[in-house]
């Protein structure tokens, strides 16, 4: 079907969007925070439809609808949901529909991006999610843990003496820690220790899962990283990995063009 497709990935922290052409190439793209002003789409070509992954709830859904209505009120919209099988990926969840739409679209995007390879997909957002995807497209299961920022924020909120450290502050603290080899990898004050400890928890989860998966499958597994906190977590990883930051939008493009 001709015409560009509007793709929207509404996560808990921000909303990413793109226009994809018939070749599934992104014509233009962007992102905005939930609290930010709405983006200006007035100069965009009219899409043939919108494909939406929304894990951020009803308020985000209403905002997305209002944004689309302001530019193309009659635009058809498809709210993507996980299903048993789609675009070459088979859903291994006990109840396939309960898998998050972002994880489902990301699996589809990853399978297309790395055909014929076993994959462990690690996405770093509000939550850190892991998906095990076999080369034949079978999603065999996953893990969900608090994201790096959520870990640090939870410690600050639920302890009497630990500070609340933001990602920006933690990144600066880790830069300082890395510059002082005499103290790495251990910190000598609380903010540095909290930042590094939560980062190492993320890296340890990923590396343990990757090694366990290679052992279970008795085959090489490509570790694919995505998400806003990936830049920081990469610095703590000691295993081979590949970055791909548009897995969900890529998966949405595939879903749209299969419709």
Curated annotation (Swiss-Prot):
GO molecular function: ATP binding; pantothenate kinase activity
GO CC, alphabetical: cytoplasm
Residues annotated as the enzyme's active site: 102 (proton acceptor)
Keyword Plastid: no
Protein location: Cytoplasm
Reactions it catalyzes: (R)-pantothenate + ATP = (R)-4'-phosphopantothenate + ADP + H(+)
Primary site of residence: cytoplasm
Pathway membership, UniProt: Cofactor biosynthesis; coenzyme A biosynthesis; CoA from (R)-pantothenate: step 1/5
Cofactor requirement: NH4(+); K(+)
Record-listed E.C. numbers: 2.7.1.33
Domain of life: Bacteria
Record-level GO BP terms: coenzyme A biosynthetic process
Annotated ATP binding sites: 9-16, 126
Cofactor binding annotation: A monovalent cation. Ammonium or potassium.
Binding site for substrate: 93, 100-103, 190
Alphabetized Pfam families for the sequence: Pan_kinase
Membership in a protein family: Belongs to the type III pantothenate kinase family.
Quaternary structure and partners: Homodimer.
Biological role stated in the UniProt entry: Catalyzes the phosphorylation of pantothenate (Pan), the first step in CoA biosynthesis.
NCBIfam families: baf, PRK13328.1-1, PRK13328.1-4
Name the UniProt record assigns to this protein: Type III pantothenate kinase
Gene name as annotated: coaX
